[in-house]
């Protein structure tokens, strides 16, 4: 999950936005990466992506976020779209019940095509349209808990919880990467062969010892 690529950043995390057309995926993306919102945002044609770099524990994390329209005619790009993704925002519109009902289908598609360890944040977007709400926050929380997903309601228009949604995924993925790196290091240390003629030397061995142990990096 993620990897070092060049000196400009320590890790590159690919993330995908999924959900029905019209739920506000493109505005969530533009709000996070450019702090921009457009009321006239049109449905995305094909695929586009944007990037944003964040600092975490002294390391630069570059998030590469892919966005595609939710219409059925773009199903052909599914495999390439999900390949290599370490995080996903599954977005529905709190004012459109159908978009919430379709979360199950999107989740199934995501799990069919993405890595099993992908971190998923379910997002109920357009929380500013409270007077038009068709899906309660409790319903969203309950479904997310049942499926083992993170959950937030957002407003791309009012910039509410958009940063938090991405930050949660990035923090979780970063933690997974670190745990895997530590596990790999411990496994390598455990399987390292012992020196053929060496002996165990404690750290408080006499300074006068002339025989030294050879250590592997």
Swiss-Prot record:
Membrane topology reported for the UniProt record: Lipid-anchor
Lipid attachment in record (S-geranylgeranyl cysteine): 214-215
The keyword Ion transport belongs to this UniProt entry's keyword annotation: no
Alphabetized UniProt keyword annotations: Cell membrane, GTP-binding, Lipoprotein, Membrane, Nucleotide-binding, Prenylation
Keyword Endoplasmic reticulum applies: no
Pfam families: Ras
Organism superkingdom: Eukaryota
Any one cellular-component term (Gene Ontology): endosome
Transmembrane segments: none
Binding locations of GTP: 19-26, 67-71, 125-128
GO MF: GTP binding; GTPase activity
Subcellular locations according to the entry: Cell membrane
InterPro entries tied to this protein: P-loop_NTPase, Rab_GTPases_membrane_traffic, Small_GTP-bd, Small_GTPase
Family membership: Belongs to the small GTPase superfamily. Rab family.
Protein name: Ras-related protein RGP2
Species of the source: Oryza sativa subsp. japonica
Organism phylogeny: Eukaryota, Viridiplantae, Streptophyta, Embryophyta, Tracheophyta
